[in-house]
Amino acid sequence: MTHQTHAYHMVNPSPWPLTGALSALLMTSGLIMWFHFNSTTLLTLGLTTNMLTMYQWWRDVIRESTFQGHHTPTVQKGLRYGMILFIISEVLFFTGFFWAFYHSSLAPTPELGGCWPPTGIHPLNPLEVPLLNTSVLLASGVSITWAHHSLMEGNRNPMLQALFITIALGIYFTLLQASEYYEAPFTISDGVYGSTFFVATGFHGLHVIIGSTFLIVCFFRQLKFHFTSNHHFGFEAAAWYWHFVDVVWLFLYVSIYWWGS
């Protein structure tokens, strides 16, 4: 921040936007190669470069904020707006899936047998694994709030305990969802029901994995004393994201599992 007359962070030249663009090219080309020629070489290369880019880019952001002090209150305000806009974009992303589901289920076509679930589909019991999954995510919402309040009060150990519980619950949810997919009596190719079910719940599951990874990073950062009671936006963003994942699941449970069955 030397020789600056403003509170903004002037970012140094970085290779990561270029490697990120390259990884996007490799991933999209790799998907085409996988779909048409059953070759995963290019896709694997794209995913690997994408993961390496994300790791190193966020590592640099942590260095700039924690060790170099570039994240002033003004910069943090901008990051908050950015995270809010990102979550709004995710809400609209999931709105598309709910739209597809309700479009198909509220007025089933003759091809579906004129009923919902379509003829021949045996939906999952909403009072079994889906209800347990709901309980797990609601409990994780409580524990992440406990972690946040502990951090704001400067209670390091309770914060670590609560964050560890949240991560464990997130991993447990993922394992339950994987077992449910494995045992489901229908597949993604079983018409519009299978498509909407697996795409909506699958993307939510991916978001749980991303959120769990975000929280694991926060856990290791807290072990290294990166967060203080008044400077912890990295954790706050992870908590916001986790609450978003919670709320989306409640809508999925009520719409697809309970009403849709």
Curated annotation (Swiss-Prot):
It is an enzyme of class 7 (translocase). It catalyses: 4 Fe(II)-[cytochrome c] + O2 + 8 H(+)(in) = 4 Fe(III)-[cytochrome c] + 2 H2O + 4 H(+)(out). Residues 1-15, 67-72, 153-155, 224-232 are mitochondrial matrix. The chain crosses the membrane at residues 16-34, 41-66, 73-105, 129-152, 156-183, 191-223, 233-256. One of its GO terms (biological process) is mitochondrial electron transport, cytochrome c to oxygen. GO terms for molecular function: cytochrome-c oxidase activity. It is found in: Mitochondrion inner membrane. The keyword Translocase applies. One of its GO terms (cellular component) is respiratory chain complex IV. Keywords: Membrane, Mitochondrion, Mitochondrion inner membrane, Translocase, Transmembrane, Transmembrane helix. InterPro entries: Cyt_c/ubiquinol_Oxase_su3, Cyt_c_oxase_su3_dom, Cyt_c_oxidase-like_su3, Cyt_c_oxidase_su3-like_sf, Cyt_c_oxidase_su3_a-hlx. Residues 35-40, 106-128, 184-190, 257-261 are mitochondrial intermembrane. The keyword Membrane applies. SUPFAM superfamilies: Cytochrome c oxidase subunit III-like (SSF81452). Its EC number is 7.1.1.9. It is a multi-pass membrane protein. Component of the cytochrome c oxidase (complex IV, CIV), a multisubunit enzyme composed of 14 subunits. The complex is composed of a catalytic core of 3 subunits MT-CO1, MT-CO2 and MT-CO3, encoded in the mitochondrial DNA, and 11 supernumerary subunits COX4I, COX5A, COX5B, COX6A, COX6B, COX6C, COX7A, COX7B, COX7C, COX8 and NDUFA4, which are encoded in the nuclear genome. PANTHER family: CYTOCHROME C OXIDASE SUBUNIT 3, CYTOCHROME C OXIDASE SUBUNIT III. Component of the cytochrome c oxidase, the last enzyme in the mitochondrial electron transport chain which drives oxidative phosphorylation. The respiratory chain contains 3 multisubunit complexes succinate dehydrogenase (complex II, CII), ubiquinol-cytochrome c oxidoreductase (cytochrome b-c1 complex, complex III, CIII) and cytochrome c oxidase (complex IV, CIV), that cooperate to transfer electrons derived from NADH and succinate to molecular oxygen, creating an electrochemical gradient over the inner membrane that drives transmembrane transport and the ATP synthase. Belongs to the cytochrome c oxidase subunit 3 family. This is Cytochrome c oxidase subunit 3. It comes from Madoqua guentheri (Guenther's dik-dik).
